[in-house]
Amino acid sequence: MNTIIDFIHTNRDRYIDELKAYLAIPSISALPEHASDVRRCAEWTAEAMRRVGLDHVQLHETPGNPIVCGEWLKAEGAPTILYYGHYDVQPVDPLELWESPPFEATVRSGEIYARGAADDKGQVFMHLKAIEAHLRQTSKLPVNMKIVLEGEEEVGSENLDAFIRDRRDELSADVVVISDSPMFDRGVPSICYGLRGLTYFQIDLRGTASDLHSGSFGGAVANPAFVLSQVLAQMKDRGGRVKVPGFYDAVRPLREEERAEFKKLPFNEKHYRKEIGAPKLFGERDYTTLERLWARPTFEVNG
């Protein structure tokens, strides 16, 4: 292991330069004008996978952006890990809030700033370089590896389900590793064994055939904005519990051992509240903040 760590330290500057080149590609999947950049990023990713020593690296075409796959399956008798990540990134607006150009990676106080540095190119790059270090120094990996990197995570992964279904046997593994979720705290690695899903609905409420001037018609007809506010206000009780019938029916209760493990974590509610800039924390009264964040569903409003 020491030789692997030494290799990483020796190649640190090269790693940073390569990561900067990766981060310089504006692979914004949500914007059609960046379609060629997303493709270029997929090709860059595939070439990086080949360079580190992965086998059978391919760009699999989909109706959308390519899915890049590679593998190393020479650890006989060892478990197989499927690593998932994505090479597409979010849009960068508003640009005026950036302290440095989003696609010109900048190192400040030992940290690298660019779009994708933390979601998810940085993590993808980290795993690839760990593989490279092992293969360069020992010519082997302690486990078998399969890599799946998509280019549509930031727009809903529309083509990932079909890709996985069509290749169930090819992608079979003992465990799946996804490095696209937050750490518990700085310097505290985290293993997430479950994530909340997402169901969203759009409400369109119309009151009259056309817009009405409030000075001329206010008080004569119901204002849709107020009606919608009244509807939304009934979704939760004063304690934060969702009042929609059946909302909690399929929610698995937390096991006592899980609650005990949560309590062991060094979570400081005052620090958390200060970090997010909230005057106070709020939610279901019978659950701690971590339990509400990690193990309970919620009902939120965007708009």
Where are these regions (language model features)?
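Acidic/histidine-rich catalytic neighborhood of metal-dependent amide-processing enzymes
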Residues: 112, 118-194
